[in-house]
């Protein structure tokens, strides 16, 4: 069974793990709705992407009546 020859210091261990940190999420403000959204994603509020209507919302008949 393989075992380490010498103890790895906290500094060496943390330097090895330095690239594992998560980066910040880039969030932008939607120009139409003013809501926050991820870049290059469809707006969840009105279903637009790049100033075009991509997704239309389903209207429930129970809500209208």
Curated annotation (Swiss-Prot):
GO terms for molecular function: structural constituent of ribosome. Keywords: Ribonucleoprotein, Ribosomal protein. It holds the Pfam family Ribosomal_L32p. The keyword Lipid biosynthesis does not apply. It comes from the Bacteria. One of its GO terms (cellular component) is large ribosomal subunit. One of its GO terms (biological process) is translation. InterPro entries: Ribosomal_bL32, Ribosomal_bL32_bact, Ribosomal_zn-bd. Belongs to the bacterial ribosomal protein bL32 family. HAMAP family: Ribosomal_bL32. This is Large ribosomal subunit protein bL32. It comes from Rickettsia prowazekii (strain Madrid E). The lineage of its organism: Bacteria, Pseudomonadati, Pseudomonadota, Alphaproteobacteria, Rickettsiales. The gene is rpmF.
